[in-house]
């Protein structure tokens, strides 16, 4: 029914084309049910989801929206500095679509410059975020330590992929936890938040931002290739119920 509605809407000015497409759709659907080429057939039942308004998201989109929500709650502009790297690049692409929410995106010449620009944005009062994957996190480690010693809020997104070294851009892996916890020189502990699903990526990004702003510290947000590119229906939250993210200007 939803597909038929989409076809009718798509070809509203060409009803004959819409009719032909619906006929082809039903023919293919009925063929799959009646053909005797398969020993077993099954029907995928409709998912038993709680009532609500849903949209389909992947982890990178959910994470991006969580950052935007945190910035709006804190009444801050959002700055995202990044260098393209699979599978984190789509966060830059998604955030660049939302300039109307006072989102500033910056594609730097390398990973170190992206992190340094984000530290500068944090110093000027933005909710500053930099994103990368495993090898990029290694390059950013000195700048992360700088933000820590300067007590500047900064969210570092690490969408993990197969490693070590440059690794395998399209292979899912969750092998950067120890590096996220301890991969900096000197005594430089910081919080680490991890997303477990595409929809949870929204809340993980929001929480990482809240912690960074409240405690004036860098926070590493871990995702991975599977979460980033996997998708699921997401029940849109009531943003009024989200914790308020404090602004640095509110912290004495």
Per-region residue spans from a language model:
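Single conserved hydrophobic/aromatic residue that forms the stacking wall/gate
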Residues: 243-252
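Short, glycine/acidic-enriched loop or turn micro-motifs at the edges of active sites
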Residues: 85, 227, 250
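Acidic active-site catalytic centers that drive phospho-/nucleotidyl reactions
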Residues: 110-111, 224, 250
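Structural signature of the thiamine diphosphate
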Residues: 22-36, 190-242
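Thiamine diphosphate
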Residues: 2-182, 189, 195
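Intrinsically disordered, low-complexity serine/threonine-rich segments
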Residues: 125-127, 208, 250
């Amino acid at each position: 029914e939803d597909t038929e509605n989409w076809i009718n809407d798509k070809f509203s000015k060409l009803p004959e084309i819409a009719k032909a497409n619906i006929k082809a759709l039903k023919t293919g659907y009925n063929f799959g049910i009646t053909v005797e080429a398969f020993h077993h057939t099954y029907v995928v039942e409709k998912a038993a989801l709680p009532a609500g308004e849903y949209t389909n998201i992947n982890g990178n989109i959910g994470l991006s929206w969580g950052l935007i929500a945190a910035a709006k709650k804190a009444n801050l502009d959002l700055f995202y500095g990044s260098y393209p790297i699979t599978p984190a690049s789509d966060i830059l692409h998604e955030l660049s679509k939302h300039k109307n929410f006072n989102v500033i995106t910056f594609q730097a010449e390398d990973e170190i410059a992206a992190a340094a620009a984000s530290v500068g944005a944090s110093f000027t009062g933005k909710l500053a975020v930099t994103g990368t994957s495993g090898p990029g996190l290694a390059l950013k480690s000195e700048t992360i330590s700088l933000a820590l010693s300067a007590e500047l809020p900064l969210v570092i997104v690490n969408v993990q992929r197969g490693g070590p070294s440059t690794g395998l851009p399209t292979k899912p892996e969750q092998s950067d936890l120890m590096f996220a916890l301890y991969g900096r020189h000197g005594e430089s502990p910081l919080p680490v938040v991890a997303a477990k699903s595409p929809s949870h990526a929204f809340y993980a990004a929001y929480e990482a931002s809240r912690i960074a702003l409240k405690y004036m510290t860098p926070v590493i947000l871990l995702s991975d290739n599977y979460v980033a590119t996997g998708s699921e229906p997401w029940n849109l939250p009531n943003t009024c119920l989200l914790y308020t993210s404090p602004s640095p200007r509110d912290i004495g």
